[in-house]
């Protein structure tokens, strides 16, 4: 079921790119076109479609249209809405704590360890708290890695331990002490109701209570993890989508050398 996707109304846009006023791009610069999807707790019918349109208008959409709607069951429906927004942001004023590292591949990391470390580097990773997902930590830790990027278990000079999922923070720290970890890698996939914020904060507090926080490299990762967020929560770095084991390894190794932790 769809509704009114196309309009014959002529619209003119300033097609000049202005980084102080950037808008979403559909097929014309500054047209502000946006696609959004959501679920409503109502039946999929004409009334449900109108509810979706009214919500889109209240969100600032101009001339919204329901491109797709589908019943999930008798009392829930799914919608894809197209529209345009007149809002813009000043791209030049945005400040972020982006990780600026010259990523080394696996072989370069191994050579870096050989030249700068007199021992193996111990990296311990897990999905901690109640998070039962391992896809993120496996992509970084497991030998086969992900998307052509081998995991830390394959790196010569690295002793990598993947503790899996649903590891209590207390057990994670206990294992880190036992293994004499240089770096802890925490993956958080479940983020509903900001449960990941609470769990990540709890880990930092426990490490500080044990007097370990300044003695290790602490990394957070996940689909909704940014470096800004990780730093704010007390981590050394955060890695989100599109990052691989070589990115993580490069940061850890160079940070250890900078802190004099490589002896």
Swiss-Prot record:
InterPro entries attached here? Cobalamin-bd (IPR006158), Cobalamin-bd_sf (IPR036724), KamE_N (IPR028991), KamE_N_sf (IPR036843)
Q: What class of enzyme is it?
A: isomerase
**Record-annotated B12-binding domain positions:** 120-259
Q: Which residues carry this modification: N6-(pyridoxal phosphate)lysine?
A: 144
Q: What sections of the sequence does the record tag as coiled-coil?
A: none
Q: Has keyword Isomerase? A: yes
Protein name in the entry: Lysine 5,6-aminomutase beta subunit
Chain positions recorded as adenosylcob(III)alamin binding sites: 130-136, 185-192, 219-223, 239-244
């Amino acid at each position: 079921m769809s509704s009114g996707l196309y309009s014959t109304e002529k619209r003119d846009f300033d097609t000049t790119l202005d980084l102080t006023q950037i808008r979403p791009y559909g097929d014309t610069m500054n047209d502000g076109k946006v696609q959004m999807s959501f679920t409503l707790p109502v039946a999929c019918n004409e009334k449900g479609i109108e509810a979706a349109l009214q919500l889109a208008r209240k969100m600032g959409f101009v001339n919204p249209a329901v491109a797709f709607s589908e019943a999930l069951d008798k009392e829930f429906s799914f919608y894809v809405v197209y529209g345009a927004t007149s809002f813009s942001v000043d791209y030049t004023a945005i400040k972020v704590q982006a990780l600026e590292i010259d990523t080394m591949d696996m072989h370069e990391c191994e050579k870096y360890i050989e030249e700068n470390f007199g021992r193996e580097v111990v990296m311990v990773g897990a999905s901690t708290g109640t998070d039962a997902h391992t896809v993120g930590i496996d992509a970084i830790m497991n030998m086969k890695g992900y998307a052509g990027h081998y995991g830390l278990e394959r790196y010569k000079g690295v002793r990598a331990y993947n503790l899996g999922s649903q590891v209590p923070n207390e057990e994670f720290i206990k294992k880190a002490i036992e293994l004499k970890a240089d770096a802890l890698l925490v993956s958080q996939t479940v983020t509903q109701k900001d449960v990941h914020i609470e769990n990540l904060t709890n880990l930092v507090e426990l490490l500080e209570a044990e007097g370990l926080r300044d003695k290790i490299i602490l990394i957070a990762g996940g689909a909704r993890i940014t470096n800004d967020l990780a730093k704010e929560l007390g981590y050394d770095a955060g890695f989100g989508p599109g990052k691989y084991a070589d990115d993580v390894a490069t940061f850890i190794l160079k940070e250890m050398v900078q802190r004099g932790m490589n002896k």
